[in-house]
Amino acid sequence: MKKLKTAMMVGLAAGALGSATAAAADWPQWGGNTLGRNMFAAGATGLPDKFEPGDFKQGTEDVDLSSAKNVKWAAKLGTQSYGNTTIANGKIFVGTNNDSMRDPKHPGDRSILLCLDEKSGDFLWQLVIPKLKSGKVNDWESLGLLSSPTVVGNRLYVVSSRCEVLCIDVDGLANGNDGPYKDEAVYVHLDTGKPPAKLGPKDGDIIWRYDMMDELGVFPHNASNCSIIVVGDMVYACTSNGQDWTHSNVPSPLSPSFIALDAKTGELKGEDDAGIGPNIFHGQWSSPSYGVVNGQGQLFFGGGDGICYAFNPKPVYDKDEDLDFLRKVWWFDANPPEYKKDKTGKTIKYPAAEGPSEINATPVFYNNRVYIATGQDPEHGEGVGHLVCLDPTKKGDITESGTIWSYKGIKRSISTVSIDPGNGLLFVSDFSGYVHCLDADTGKLHWIYDMKAHMWGSTLVADGKVYVGDEDGDFVVLASDKKMTLLSETYFPAPIYSTPVVANGVLYVATQSHLYALHDEARAKAATDQKTAK
């Protein structure tokens, strides 16, 4: 496949999170049940540490479960699946492409939001998203839907490959067309020249639609993919604004990089005041996180300029600009001086291996600290990276004052960290194929594990284990411990570019072509019996 553009995807105070209506053991958004986006599945026990994906039935791409081990079910996706899986209220949502066409009235290259039944993996409905007419400069062919859906009650929020923020009914059209948006039949054929489609109960139902290209003039570079965060009645998203095909020009330097929308109506409520546009290295593919610092909420965002920002979540009206702004609280340049200029003082140009990078990973807020790593588009290859732990209680430019610790042993990374609250260990993968284990408080390195292949997804910590896969299809289970212990290594028959997730005692691993639900009944029963005995 040419130019795999995105795992740049390669996702509140108690009671303030709308997705609390999902079951506590669900995984309703990128980061599970925490707006801090820590890749940790709290309360998960009895998860499998060994499994086999099984063989395909002869002449098909259907998994023969009799040849598998600890596989509850396996569902066919498309041929490229980068978006991370979310699970809420008995439904699974995952992004993919249309190469495994489920409906003949929607042929050709499309992005797909797929909804499956959590218990069986059976198909429930899909939202078909047509490709942008402008082509690969904004919407690279065959990539599919890259955003990890966010579920809040009976609504789902996602950034489409058309650079839209969509609010969607989790039941699709099966319970009618709820509106106010009623033009789904037209939408699914946008830019195709086809008349409105005849839709049914297995098609998606859009509640509202906010087109960031039309409304804000943004210019996404090759792909749009932010995983939305919902805080109270507000939706926050990265706009994916970036460079054009020349890789030297930002067509819309004044367009915002980060916005707030009304969760019920989709109305624009605010945009960032950071002025990131002119300084974008390449594209912008980070997703926001949220935390409460000294009683005040902060939104954390990794910019395409290599700077990590904290914004006040409450928009403030600016009379001079006649705009509502999300005001900066602090900002931190994550590129050390030696990544910007060499020993002779000469500027190191992006995207040189020894040079500066943007931030594609999601900032993680944990224990009143913010963790973030730098990296680049995987097409740019390997290079130097930087992992930092920041103090979010500071104000203004905290590049000099805000570092609690930093780690330059990591290479370029588009992965989000995972921290185990039980032992204070931090795990993070990098694009060069290394899994790093550090002390989250001090930054002390404990060990490095070599996967021997590029890694796009993030580590997941759950049940005392660390789960992670790579682009060769290798999937490892490591012990969450200061001593490196490999519990198992499994080969899946397709690359793994996304992050494993856990919901209701089941581990989900998405390859490019299949979603596997992994469950060890014996271990799960033993864990349940142990809890009951206590």
Task: Put a short name on every predicted segment.
Residues 1-10, 18:
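Bacterial N-terminal signal peptides that target proteins for export
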